[in-house]
């Protein structure tokens, strides 16, 4: 057994790691860039979708600025269009908790572990997700892109959670995320456990390359992993 102190904070990147978005993000992104003339069937559309995949976990505003570098007007217009499309797509396709997510959050809280639910989405988008999931009271802290200077892949959101919740050591933190950029953020923040959630966001190979210390196919296994300070197998091969 390790002499390490127990994990006192779990930061959960909601979309992908704890909730399924039913491709709402991708649909909203495609609709948003279409307002700027980037439409299906064009080379620009293909490049944009590659960039969307590469930047999963980034704030939508940062993604749009990466697509339209030096063109602030188009980047801002696309960001506004994304916000509108995201809400509309969520109405059409829904956002649901992953199986086991509610129980996992309950078990972490019951064990005395602080929980931060976070996302690089804007406050209105994140608030809408919390409302749909009924998770306003599920965590000790809720953070979105508007609460930190930078989103993923930078460490700001995780570090903000650490500061606001009074965690004394970054090594007492676990982060669970489904995106490569989320893993990078957790590593840069110094989290001890960096858990990659196997989903339709990024695959096991990408999460491992980014620095995930563990992989989970079921968020229901997270409380046991945290309780064991990461000293249990959690890198299944069947979801490669």
Predicted features by range, described:
Residues 3-99:
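N-terminal helical cap/lid subdomain that shapes the substrate entry/recognition surface
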Residues 39, 136-140, 168:
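Conserved H-loop
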């Amino acid at each position: 057994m390790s002499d390490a102190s127990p994990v006192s904070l779990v930061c959960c990147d909601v979309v992908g790691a704890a909730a399924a978005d039913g491709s709402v993000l991708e649909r909203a992104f495609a609709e948003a860039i279409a307002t700027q003339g980037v439409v299906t069937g064009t080379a620009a559309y293909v490049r944009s979708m590659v960039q969307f995949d590469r930047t999963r976990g980034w704030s939508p505003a940062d993604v749009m600025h990466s697509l339209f570098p030096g063109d602030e007007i188009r980047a801002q217009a696309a960001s506004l269009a994304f916000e509108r499309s995201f809400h509309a797509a969520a109405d059409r396709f829904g956002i649901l908790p992953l199986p086991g997510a509610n129980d996992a959050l309950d078990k972490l809280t019951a064990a005395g572990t602080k929980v931060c639910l976070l996302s690089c989405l804007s406050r209105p988008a994140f608030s809408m997700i919390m409302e749909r999931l009924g998770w306003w009271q599920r965590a000790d802290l809720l953070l979105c892109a508007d609460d930190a200077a930078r989103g993923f892949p930078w460490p700001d959101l995780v570090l903000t959670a650490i500061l606001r919740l009074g965690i004394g050591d970054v090594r007492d933190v676990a982060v669970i995320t489904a995106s490569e950029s989320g893993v990078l953020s957790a590593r840069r923040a110094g989290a001890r456990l960096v858990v990659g959630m196997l989903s339709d966001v990024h695959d096991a190979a990408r999460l491992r390359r980014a620095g995930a210390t563990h992989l989970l196919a079921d968020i229901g296994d997270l409380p046991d992993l945290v309780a064991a300070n990461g000293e249990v197998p959690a890198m299944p091969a069947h979801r490669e």
